Amino acid sequence: MSEQLNTMDIKEIMSFLPHRYPFLLIDRVLDYTPGETLHAIKNVTINEPFFQGHFPVQPVMPGVLILEAMAQATGLLAYKTMKEASEDSLYYFAGIDKARFKRVVEPGDQLHFEVKMIKERRGIGVFTGEVKVDGELVCSAEIMCARREISK
């Protein structure tokens, strides 16, 4: 008997993340285990707005956007670990350490994000993340996010 995967489609992703086009950088969550790991994807197409200027002749996805997408995957894992989305709080990208880039990302690539929760204490979570294309490492980093109440 096969194991049931925990997935998220774009509608569910949008119920957790405040980002919208062109800054919503996660297309689908393939699997997650609350408090442990999350595996998500982003399909990179030539239609991405950043390719207009980075770089028109040789399009390359900016590294900061790869890190932002990793942070969004981290936020999804944080929300799923807390078991609820709340209109009264957000997870903010609070820090990054040990970021390394190993390969460029071009139109047609599919990014695979694997984020792991290391610890959480008083609303601050520490995670590790890797991004791969076709099994080849693109980027790795340690990410911190902080849960904050928001006023309306």
UniProtKB/Swiss-Prot annotation:
One Gene Ontology MF term: (3R)-hydroxyacyl-[acyl-carrier-protein] dehydratase activity
Annotated compartments: Cytoplasm
Catalytic activity, reaction form: a (3R)-hydroxyacyl-[ACP] = a (2E)-enoyl-[ACP] + H2O
Pfam families assigned: FabA (PF07977)
Enzyme's top EC category: lyase
InterPro entries reported for this sequence: FabA_FabZ (IPR013114), FabZ (IPR010084), HotDog_dom_sf (IPR029069)
One GO process term, biological-process aspect: fatty acid biosynthetic process
EC number(s) from the headed UniProt entry: 4.2.1.59
Keywords (A to Z) from UniProt: Cytoplasm, Lipid A biosynthesis, Lipid biosynthesis, Lipid metabolism, Lyase
GO-annotated cellular components: cytoplasm; membrane
Known function: Involved in unsaturated fatty acids biosynthesis. Catalyzes the dehydration of short chain beta-hydroxyacyl-ACPs and long chain saturated and unsaturated beta-hydroxyacyl-ACPs.
Family of the protein in this entry: Belongs to the thioester dehydratase family. FabZ subfamily.
Name of this chain's protein: 3-hydroxyacyl-[acyl-carrier-protein] dehydratase FabZ
Naturally occurring in which organism (per UniProt): Shewanella woodyi (strain ATCC 51908 / MS32)
